[in-house]
Amino acid sequence: DVCSSDLSNHMCFSVPKQDSLFSGDHVMAWSTSVVIPPDGNMADYLASLALLCSRTESRYWPTHGPPLDSPHDYVQALIAHRLQRMQDIMQLLKASPWRIADMVEQLYPKLDVRLHGAASRSIFAAILYLQDCGEIEALESTTLDGLYQKSS
């Protein structure tokens, strides 16, 4: 069995005889995956996480980091984290338009500056998702440098 992952060419593979799943970069015990548009799509990523929640494997083997035992609660927490991050973005946009770089500063105040690029791309993936849902709109172009506001 396979499911798509954080990028279109990343997959998860089940090993039923070992009650295990090779989760690749999709689910890692030490970090969340960075969903990078245009190849990475937040809707696809969330759907894949939901699919994993319906599966029964008791151990995940990520590409990076230690194995993850009893992964289902962790996968549910990953979904909750992504949904909360999108709520955080919507909260920022309630008052005024924002650029992604400014959102990174606000949402990740203690993040090492070397990781701001990854955080920006993750926020951009969330923005594209929210834009597809009709929740937000671009005031300029839909890019990493664009200006975004809550849809009117």
PLM segments and residue spans:
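C-terminal regulatory/interaction regions
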Residues: Q91-S152
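Metallo-beta-lactamase
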Residues: S5-D88
